[in-house]
Amino acid sequence: SVYLATDERDEGRWIAGEIDRRRSEGTSYNNMAVFYRTNAQSRMLEDMLLRAGVPYRIVGGTRFFDRAEIRDVMAYLTLVVNPADDIAAKRVVNVPRRGIGKTTIERIDQYGREMNMPFLTAAELAVVDPDIRASTRNAVGEFIQVIKDGATYGGDLRKVVEMIIDKAGLIRALQDEGTDEARGRVENIQ
């Protein structure tokens, strides 16, 4: 079948509808496939399939929400809503690379354990720790500020996501890499 969609959402809805139609005609999910050219196209398609309750698996690629760059964005958003999420904080404290090394991360983690506080709160102590290099303290401070800005941002979710991506420098860092893979990751984030 050929269908001229008005946008990617319309395309995803149509595909999910076609799958549902064929399923109701007796076709097994195992006998259906959807091909797409770029990984960036899978996001909307996966979203529509999930909404329609259609089981799927990705062959030769990674599910959209399992991609590192998407998990990074999700970790930032998690911290905006729940700054006590240590797993999310440790995932993105140095994403993109901002000069916060393993030793500093371990030190922050140790502060948190010793003082029974979340990683992000402990990171605020690192900002004033004279035993940590000034450039690293500044980088930790910038990371904390991104999360605080996100938490106080009074816009709709799309604007919050855009602000976090911009302030964290996620797209800028990938654009600076200049590789085809990095360009694909930028498409995924956008």
Predicted feature locations:
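Conserved helicase C-terminal RecA-like lobe
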Residues: 28, 39-54, 67-69, 74-190
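Conserved RecA-like helicase motor-core motifs
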Residues: 53-63
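Inter-lobe coupling/hinge region of RecA-like P-loop helicase motors
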Residues: 1-36, 61, 89-90, 123-132, ...
